Amino acid sequence: MFDKFIAAAAAFAASLAGAAGTAHAGKDLDAIKARGQVVCGVTTGGISGFMSVDSQGKWVGLDVDICRAVSAAIFGDSEKVKFVPVTAIQRFTALQSGEVDMLSNNTTWTLQRDTALGFDFTGVTYYDGQGFMVNKKLGVKSAKELNGATVCVAPGSTTELNLADYFRANKMSFKPVVIEKVDEIRAAFFSGRCDVYTTDRSGLYATRVANAPNPDDYVILPEIISKEPLGPVVRHGDNQFGDIVRWAQYAMLEAEEYGISSKNVDDMLKNENPTIKRILGVTPGMGKALGVDEKWVYNIIKQVGNYGEVFDKNVGMGSPLKI
């Protein structure tokens, strides 16, 4: 995951040294500005640490903060976001139809989605892999002991395909219990309707911490059966909005590398490092290139944080997940 981030950050730093052009307005961005908010698709039922509703009814999480960063870049206000819950099956139709402007909901970047569906993936925000969770009383230590098991899985996902491929490759059989909504999958698993719950490992850890009746009763098996680069998705065609989503991610990474955080960003405005001056818009040009305010990175970091801050509070050591 971090190799991709470093490469992205390096590209961002290199771009800061070049001359900035002027962005051409795109229809999606024009519609977003006219509406006054970004509409962001998140997962129905939520995933603790990535996207969920807190006790005050506010959406929080790593994926949620990416949407807020995009809002801060466009409007100078991270709160101008509407979150629309969608299932794994609904999400791509919602994006294609314009019901949402972007997805930030643990969607895996695949060749098929990036080409045939008319989408653009703007980067990787979390590099994951698919795993399996079982009740300890099942007595299973490895996924290779799951022959004949009943498995809860979401439809319309890479998870469903990976599951079938893994069992076929290991000459095992399984009985799928296919359920569309994440909260209903969890309920089925914890009620004993299926022996196994399979999804991205981050989701398994989040589910065990946030939803299990007794987290100590459940174990996540050691096998990782796929590579799951997760990140935001936009429609192909309006490159300007896609560029803003992409560079908002890169800016959060670059800010972390240069030690710019939500706590010190005001002091950093006085820093004499030429790159920091360009990042924060003290030296103008990069905002013009994207068609946003020159303080776009400042607004992201001040209101949302750099990538390290966002990771730590949502899924890292500052969170219940402690990834």
Task: Enumerate the predicted regions with their spans.
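Bacterial N-terminal signal peptides that target proteins for export
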Residues: 1-9
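C-terminal segment of classical bacterial N-terminal signal peptides
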Residues: 14-23
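Extracytoplasmic small-molecule ligand-binding "clamshell" domains
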Residues: 25-104, 290, 303, 307
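Sec-exported extracytoplasmic/periplasmic mature domains
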Residues: 33-37, 71-79, 96-100, 137, ...
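Bilobed "Venus flytrap"/periplasmic-binding protein-like clamshell domains
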Residues: 37-49, 59-75, 108, 128-184
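Extended ligand-binding regions for polar small-molecule ligands
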Residues: 65-74, 137-140, 144, 149-150, ...
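Acidic, polar ligand-binding/catalytic clefts
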Residues: 68, 72, 76, 80-145, ...
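C-terminal functional modules
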Residues: 282-323
